[in-house]
From Swiss-Prot:
UniProt keywords, alphabetically: Isoprene biosynthesis, Magnesium, Metal-binding, Thiamine biosynthesis, Thiamine pyrophosphate, Transferase
Gene name of the encoded protein: dxs
Protein purpose: Catalyzes the acyloin condensation reaction between C atoms 2 and 3 of pyruvate and glyceraldehyde 3-phosphate to yield 1-deoxy-D-xylulose-5-phosphate (DXP).
Organism of this sequence: Psychrobacter arcticus (strain DSM 17307 / VKM B-2377 / 273-4)
Name of protein: 1-deoxy-D-xylulose-5-phosphate synthase
Entry's Gene Ontology BP terms: 1-deoxy-D-xylulose 5-phosphate biosynthetic process; isopentenyl diphosphate biosynthetic process, methylerythritol 4-phosphate pathway; terpenoid biosynthetic process; thiamine biosynthetic process
NCBIfam families in alphabetical order: dxs (TIGR00204), PRK05444.2-2 (NF003933)
């Protein structure tokens, strides 16, 4: 049964939205809690494609915005997902699809955190509740999913380059179609966005860029560019329509609607700007405007559509708009999990178990502990203070914490520059985003063998965010770089001590650890320094004189999976008496423990299996193969059967982490099956 947005009754914290009528003015609804039942959305239910919007009046569009916002609230409660950014672009999404003729006109979303409303209006309304789940809708726009998703995204700052490419190709083919790129102020801090804008002016391309300025990326936007946008806002409208007709006469948006800025920026006298960055580089500039005012958006976007050459429309929005808790805490509500079931039975309290730490928390604890001991430690993050576990470090050591915004290339070379002056920089970065700073890692850090440590978070399969965020290529692109040393801890305690080991090393190092919680291992003190390039035999199962001897070489958090798989094989009636198993925690991808490999070969190992949460091609198993084939003395005389277990040569679709592991044969059952095939 559907619930009307006009009649929802408050039932519990998660049960319903605030009861109030949908106005036909531009005063949007604000809801207090997330509805459990599908809301009543008569206007939205009439929209199966953007073409259906053409019959709506402006008043209908305003009312539709409330219905769409409530529907996104409901759907996010069912499936979880990115939240605040989606609520902030409801009106913009409606205005774009009303004015443009998608899919002939091209709409390009940057990052994709804000594309849920776009998915709803483009025929995917009834599947939005499946978003991020296995075989459901993807978390981001994806070309294979819909003709309306013009460019696949997930990383930031790509939209203007992609949109410019579309515009130039359309011009070359003589096709008159509008290309509109939507980019946030956080993504605009990425250098790639400015490279594209510079080229758009050079090419005199017909390109519309919409700057969705909510003073946030995932957390608060920072830096000189963010301050420049604030000055544009506080100085009033800077409307340039010299190529588009008469000046737009409209009121300045209510400052109180965006008073969150006052919490982030020092009050100051603001000059009346006669020019701005966008106009200075050659864009026609409209703005700033209220991004929640549909009539105003329709007027401005209609004019911008008529402009020849590159044009930028600057709008202000509120992240989490219309959901009171998200407006108050936009960082906390950047993304949410699904709501708990109402009928969840209360759990019987047992002896309280200490919760497992997230690996990002382990890193944060190490940072704070080490910073007390060593005043040379400096920490850098490209806009991932919260996600990387650095909030407490930033609070305790603000002068040693550097958030460089979404600028991975800069972050890596910044660390290199710091290292030349006798300090020890640590770059905390997600594996998938380190790819964006690869040239800098090689040219600016490793080539000079500078003393920089990389703390690589979100390594391996990351679950619902899917292939765009998977960290499954780092072993391959790091281990081929001279001077680079790579560690892969099996649990929280080992992560802490490997972080310390790499910190104490003079040179380029990387510690790679996964998303989420660990195994529950207790972190021991004081911090240890492990032997570099030395593995640990975790267990030996089976009879010493068994005819088959398997060495299971596990990297990182796959050690626990390897141990469970080995125990199952040791109990197997078919293999228990015929196979001895060595479970090895390799710890290091580079340098490998080649001494241990030689010892295992000399002991008569008949089978070797490598296990990693990384692509098989180029991964740690490949490193073992290369050593055995090229450098091992023992392997020339004794050649065991070899199996590499890891991620196959394909992008792994979104789903839960456990579903992804099973899909790749990296769950315990999958590993056992592959080992049994090897031993058969």
């Amino acid at each position: 049964m559907q619930q009307s947005p006009h009649s929802l009754q408050s039932q519990s914290l998660f049960a319903s939205a605030v009861d109030s009528a949908v106005p036909l003015s531009n005063l949007q609804q604000t809801y207090a809690v997330i509805p459990r039942e599908r809301p009543y959305t008569p206007l939205l239910d009439r929209v199966d494609s953007p073409a259906d919007l053409k019959a709506f009046s402006t008043a209908d569009l305003i009312a539709l915005a409330d219905e769409l916002r409530l529907f996104v609230l409901y759907s996010a409660g069912q499936s979880g997902g990115h939240f605040g950014a989606n609520l902030g672009v409801i009106e913009l999404t409606i205005a774009l699809h009303y004015l443009l003729d998608a899919p002939q006109d091209q709409i390009v979303w940057d990052v994709g955190h804000q594309a849920y409303a776009h998915k709803v209006l483009t025929g995917r309304r009834d599947r939005l509740g499946t978003i991020r789940s296995k075989a459901g809708l993807t978390a981001f726009p994806e070309r294979a999913e819909s003709v309306y998703d013009t460019f696949g995204v997930g990383h930031s700052s790509t939209s203007i380059s992609a949109g410019l490419g579309m515009s130039l190709a359309l011009r070359y083919q003589g096709r008159a179609q509008t290309v509109a790129c939507i980019i946030g102020d956080g993504a605009m801090t990425g250098g790639m966005a400015f490279e594209a804008m510079n080229d758009a002016v050079q090419q005199d391309a017909d390109l519309m860029v919409i700057l969705n300025d909510n003073d946030m990326s995932i957390s608060c936007s920072i830096g000189g560019f963010s301050r420049h946008l604030a000055m544009l806002w506080e100085s009033g409208y800077q409307v340039d329509i010299s190529d588009a007709g008469e000046p737009i006469l409209c009121r300045r948006p209510d400052m109180q609607a965006f008073d969150r800025r006052k919490r982030h920026k020092k009050q100051r006298d603001v000059p009346q700007l006669e020019d701005n960055l966008f106009k200075a580089i050659g864009f026609t500039y409209f703005g700033p405007f209220d991004g929640h005012n549909i009539p105003e958006l329709l007027r401005v976007l209609s004019l911008a559509k008529q402009v020849k050459g590159p044009v930028l429309v600057h709008i202000y929005t509120t992240k989490g708009k219309g959901f009171a808790p998200a407006e108050l805490d936009p960082v906390g509500y950047h993304a949410i999990g699904s709501l708990p079931a109402e009928d969840d039975a209360p759990k019987i309290e047992k002896a309280a178990a200490k919760p497992s730490l997230k690996y990002s928390q382990v890193f944060g604890q190490f940072l704070c502990d080490k910073a007390v001991q060593d005043n040379k430690l400096l920490a850098i993050t490209p806009a991932m203070e919260e996600g990387s576990g650095m909030i407490e470090f930033a609070r305790q050591f603000p002068e040693r914490f550097f958030d460089v915004a979404i600028a991975e290339q800069h972050a890596v070379t910044l660390a290199g520059g710091m290292a030349t002056q006798g300090v020890k920089p640590i770059v905390a970065i997600y594996s998938t985003f380190l790819q964006r700073g690869y040239d800098q890692l090689i040219h600016d850090v490793a080539l000079q063998n500078l003393d920089v440590m990389f703390a690589i978070d979100r390594a391996g399969l990351v679950g619902e965010d899917g292939a765009t965020h998977a960290g499954v290529f780092d072993f391959a692109f790091l281990r081929c770089v001279p001077n680079m040393m790579i560690a892969a801890p099996k649990d929280e305690n080992e992560c802490y001590h490997l972080l310390n080991t790499c910190y104490e090393y003079q040179g380029c190092t990387a510690v790679r650890y996964p998303r989420g919680v660990g195994t529950g291992a207790t972190i021991t003190q004081p911090a240890q320094t492990y032997n570099i390039g030395k593995a640990v035999i975790e267990s030996v199962l089976g009879e010493k004189d068994a005819p088959k001897k398997l060495a299971l070489l596990a990297f990182g958090t796959m050690v626990a999976t390897a141990q469970q798989a080995a125990e199952m094989i040791a109990k197997s009636p078919l293999l228990a008496s015929s196979c001895q198993l060595h479970v090895v925690n390799m710890r290091w991808v580079k340098p490998l423990d080649t001494t241990l490999l030689e010892q295992l070969l000399l002991q008569g190992v008949t089978h070797i299996a490598t296990l990693e949460e990384h692509t098989i091609m180029g991964g740690a198993g490949s490193a073992v193969n290369e050593y055995l084939l090229n450098d091992s003395a023992a392997f020339k005389n004794h050649r065991p059967a070899i199996c590499n277990i890891g991620i196959p040569d394909r992008f792994v679709a979104h789903g839960s982490q456990s579903e992804q592991w099973a899909d790749c044969g990296l769950d315990v059952e999958g590993v056992v099956n592959q080992l049994q095939q090897l031993l058969s």
